[in-house]
């Protein structure tokens, strides 16, 4: 029984009256209406093209913007279009199909009235139940136009008004967004069944470098530890510069009850990271001495470029001149004594002519060698009586050659030499350079598949020493990865991917530092450029992104943005990161811990993501 027949039945049952007291429609009127309906082809039926649509596009207004359309929908469909939903818009008249993303809304608007009209304000304030009917509205950004072969190209036109709009289901949404991969970040906000991942077996993301930014407490450590755990599982070599020692216990499962509950809700396991190794500088302590594999290491003076070394020390022009005079005299003395290159060794003879001091120091030169040369020159320039004190046996055994070489240095200004030697001696007293009680870093072992090396820098007060450690290890990693890459190519294999995480990157590469340390920055930039082709990726982690210079931001192609409250920082990042819509930028200051805006090269558009809880133990986390 249809609605008209039902109405007739009710009227007959009530003695010719409707229940609401309104008299019946005259029979001849109803008959005329029915005849008109039949003449028009029967009752209205929605066109098949509109079946299943959640809404339709609205006409444009003077306030419409390029690239976006307004979609209206009945109130029962509002819940079907959460934020970040992907939709398909079928422009019927011109037979075009578009893909779009919900960037604003959904909003509830009254039918036929302004939401701020006096009558609605009065009804709402007084709690009267006679609320008007309402509908939903969303703003959709056009992502692309779908061609007949399934390809998506940049849109050349706009969908026409009254075009039906369909919500993509989760599998199709994930396919359009490109969320597939073997390293999981979390789930898309509003789409708990869509996992947001990155492909570690492609050069699209990690070898093109990542920035993880956010204020304290935003969830950066959770993101970093979770990524390290997953990269280890798929055989990536990971090196993590840990400035606080908080990652030195990731070999154990998390003991945080809230993390355990969050992991259970996501269906994830509580587990530690396998194959972890903790390195700390000789003479320093680690935050986790109970770790099963703790190793001390030394710095080798010859591994550092003298140009990077003098920048890190912050030498003045006068001190810099004298530093290079001492280095040059020391090189000649090492050659004369056959320390390097060794006499009769043709390969070392050739290598000595090709040493690039912008990349590395002079082989086998130690800080102690430089102190002997510099001390003797200062002794002579200052007019000190007696013979200068010499510490190296090789120099003592040929004192005549040593004296002749240091006297060939034409120089003056004892004060500059004295300040320079004071700085070098302070470094020497730390006993971190060329210390025979500790081993050099074994980069070949460090870059084995699935190995996680945590360089604990927490027990270092000196930023200069910390930066020397990072600079030397970065350079060693680059050289080893170059060798691994060449060997893999010759064998027809893919090299082991390597990821290097640099915590508190603003201390290593701040705007002020790269202005005073251009050589050091150029080394990092060279690693970034070469690393893209050699499966070597850098991850810059910082809570103070305002201190990162534009030159560093320009090296990064993938971003995880946690809560950032400073509007000036957000404005600056907007100039460096493209494709993020306004609503995501405006949400950054209000993100909850664990939420992040993710802009990765494999994603078709940036997404708000609920980052997965960390399965492993972090120290110093409240």
Positions of PLM-derived features:
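Phosphate-binding and hydrolysis-coupling loops of NTP-dependent motor/remodeling domains
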Residues: 2-22, 36, 40-48, 57, ...
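Conserved beta-strand position immediately N-terminal to the Walker
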Residues: 210-211, 453, 539
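Conserved ASCE P-loop ATPase motor domains encompassing nucleic-acid-directed helicases/translocases
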Residues: 28-177
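Hydrophobic residues in beta-strands of the RecA-like P-loop NTPase core, especially within AAA+ ATPase
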Residues: 241, 502, 541-542
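Glycine-rich phosphate-binding loop of nucleotide-binding enzymes
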Residues: 184-280, 550, 598, 621
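P-loop NTP-binding catalytic core
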Residues: 140, 148-209, 615, 620-622
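P-loop NTPase motor domains
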Residues: 230, 245, 249, 255, ...
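Conserved ATP-driven motor cores of ASCE-family P-loop NTPases powering translocation/secretion/packaging/pilus
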Residues: 129, 520-610
């Amino acid at each position: 029984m249809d609605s008209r027949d039902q109405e007739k039945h009710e009227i007959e049952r009530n003695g010719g009256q409707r229940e609401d007291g309104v008299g019946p429609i005259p029979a001849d009127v109803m008959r005329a209406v029915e005849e008109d309906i039949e003449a028009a082809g029967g009752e209205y039926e929605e066109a098949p093209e509109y079946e299943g649509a959640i809404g339709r596009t609205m006409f444009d207004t003077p306030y419409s913007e390029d690239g976006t359309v307004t979609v209206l929908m009945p109130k029962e469909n509002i819940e079907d279009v959460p934020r970040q939903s992907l939709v398909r818009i079928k422009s019927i008249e011109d037979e075009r199909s578009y893909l779009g993303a919900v960037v604003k809304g959904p909003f509830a608007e009254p039918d036929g009235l302004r939401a701020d009209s006096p009558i609605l304000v009065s009804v709402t304030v007084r709690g009267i139940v006679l609320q008007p009917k309402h509908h939903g509205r969303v703003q959709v950004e056009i992502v692309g136009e779908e061609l007949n072969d399934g390809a998506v190209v940049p849109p050349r036109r706009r969908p026409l008004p009254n075009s039906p709009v369909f919500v993509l289901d989760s599998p199709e949404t994930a396919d359009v967004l490109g969320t597939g991969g073997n390293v999981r970040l979390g789930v898309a906000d509003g789409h708990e069944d869509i996992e947001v991942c990155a492909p570690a077996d492609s050069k699209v993301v990690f070898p093109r470098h990542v920035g993880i930014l956010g204020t304290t407490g935003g969830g950066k450590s959770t993101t970093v530890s979770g990524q390290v755990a997953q990269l280890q599982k798929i055989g990536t070599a990971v090196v993590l510069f840990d400035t606080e020692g908080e990652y030195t216990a990731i070999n154990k499962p998390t003991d945080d009850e809230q993390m355990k509950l969050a992991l259970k809700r996501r269906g994830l396991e509580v587990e530690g990271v396998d194959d972890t190794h903790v390195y700390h500088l000789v003479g320093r302590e680690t935050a986790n001495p109970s770790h099963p594999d703790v190793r001390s290491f030394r710095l080798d003076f010859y591994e550092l470029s003298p140009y990077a070394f003098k920048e890190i020390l912050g030498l003045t022009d006068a001190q810099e001149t004298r530093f290079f005079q001492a280095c040059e005299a020391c090189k000649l003395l090492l050659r004369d004594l056959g320390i390097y290159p060794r006499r009769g060794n043709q390969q070392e003879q050739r290598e000595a002519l090709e040493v690039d001091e912008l990349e590395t120091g002079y082989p086998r030169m130690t800080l102690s060698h430089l102190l002997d040369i510099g001390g003797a020159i200062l002794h002579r320039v200052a007019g000190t009586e007696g013979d200068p004190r010499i510490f190296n046996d090789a120099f003592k055994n040929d004192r005549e050659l040593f004296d002749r070489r240091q006297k060939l240095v034409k120089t003056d200004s004892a004060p500059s030499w004295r300040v320079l030697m004071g700085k070098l001696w302070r470094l020497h007293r730390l006993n971190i350079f060329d210390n025979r009680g500790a081993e050099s870093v074994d980069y070949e072992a460090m870059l084995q598949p699935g190995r996680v090396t945590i360089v604990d820098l927490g027990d270092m007060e000196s930023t200069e020493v910390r930066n020397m450690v990072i600079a030397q290890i970065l350079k060693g990693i680059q050289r080893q990865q170059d060798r691994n890459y060449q060997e893999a190519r010759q064998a027809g294999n893919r090299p082991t991917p390597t990821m290097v995480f640099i915590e508190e990157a603003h201390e290593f590469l701040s705007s002020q530092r790269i202005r005073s340390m251009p050589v050091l920055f150029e080394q990092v930039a060279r690693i970034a450029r070469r690393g893209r082709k050699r499966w070597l990726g850098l991850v810059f982690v910082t809570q103070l992104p305002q201190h990162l210079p534009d030159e560093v931001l320009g090296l990064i192609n993938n971003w995880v943005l946690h809560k950032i409250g400073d509007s000036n920082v957000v404005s600056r990042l907007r100039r460096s990161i493209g494709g993020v819509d306004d609503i995501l930028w405006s949400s950054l200051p209000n993100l909850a811990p664990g939420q992040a805006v993710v802009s990765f090269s494999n994603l078709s558009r940036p997404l708000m993501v609920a980052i997965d809880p960390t399965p492993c133990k972090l120290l110093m986390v409240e």
